[in-house]
Amino acid sequence: MSHNFHVIIPARYHSSRFPGKLLQEINGITVIERVYRQALLAEPKSVIIATDHDEIADRAIQFGAEVVITSHTHQTGTDRIAEVVAKGSFAPDDVIVNVQGDEPFIRPKLIQQVACSLTKTKAPVSTLCWPISSLQILNNPNVVKVVCTRDNHALYFSRSAIPFHRDDKNAYSNTFRHIGLYAYRAAFLLEFVSWPPCALEQIECLEQLRILWSGFSIRVDEACEEPLQDINTKEDLILAQQYFLDTFNV
């Protein structure tokens, strides 16, 4: 049974920290194919890989994926999936889920959750978070933190430790890390990428701040399952390969 949403996977080859990571293999299967397989398990209406790289496109076609070739000038994955939406026959209210191409173990239930959340809110965007479990994670600028209202809408995203525990600098209770999984209404996605970057976004290097700065809300739900590590470095790839061996007893 398919669900009423579409998945688009932005697949960039020239990652700054680990170029070509999507074509690296985990037990004989490329990272991008593993992401694609996980997305299919969420049972969306469609799964599309958006890329500007010939080898990624060729590999994706070989394993049966629908591929859209996009511009090489895009600065973000959101810009890339917006091009796919602009080229396609999507309705304005269609739900588009942006699944990052470097998450080979993305949980299908999280994809379903973020899509379902968008259908139950007036916010034009939904995303997920997870409780922070250590001071090290809280203080890591590569981990994006989020604080929310009582009705689960984002107040702010930051690379800094928020909220700041004034009376106990070693505390991390009631802190949450953002999970970079988004669902958008198709029409809003196209509107969003037409806006120029805002100052806050440029300071933090977090494009979702453009949405808040522009006066729109982002629904944020706690993930129904703990998210697994994405792949940003060669060390992450080694950990992912070991995780696969440990989990599946290969």
Curated annotation (Swiss-Prot):
InterPro entries found in the cross-reference section: Cytidylyl_trans, KdsB, Nucleotide-diphossugar_trans
Classification of source organism: Bacteria, Pseudomonadati, Pseudomonadota, Gammaproteobacteria, Legionellales
Similarity field: Belongs to the KdsB family.
An annotated Gene Ontology molecular function: 3-deoxy-manno-octulosonate cytidylyltransferase activity
Extent of the signal sequence: none
This protein's pathway: Nucleotide-sugar biosynthesis; CMP-3-deoxy-D-manno-octulosonate biosynthesis; CMP-3-deoxy-D-manno-octulosonate from 3-deoxy-D-manno-octulosonate and CTP: step 1/1; Bacterial outer membrane biogenesis; lipopolysaccharide biosynthesis
Catalytic activity: 3-deoxy-alpha-D-manno-oct-2-ulosonate + CTP = CMP-3-deoxy-beta-D-manno-octulosonate + diphosphate
HAMAP family on file: KdsB
Keyword flag Signal: no
Domain of life: Bacteria
Chief location category: cytoplasm
GO biological process, one term: lipopolysaccharide biosynthetic process
Record's function text: Activates KDO (a required 8-carbon sugar) for incorporation into bacterial lipopolysaccharide in Gram-negative bacteria.
Gene source species: Legionella pneumophila (strain Paris)
Designated name of the protein: 3-deoxy-manno-octulosonate cytidylyltransferase
GO CC annotations on file: cytosol
Transmembrane segments: none
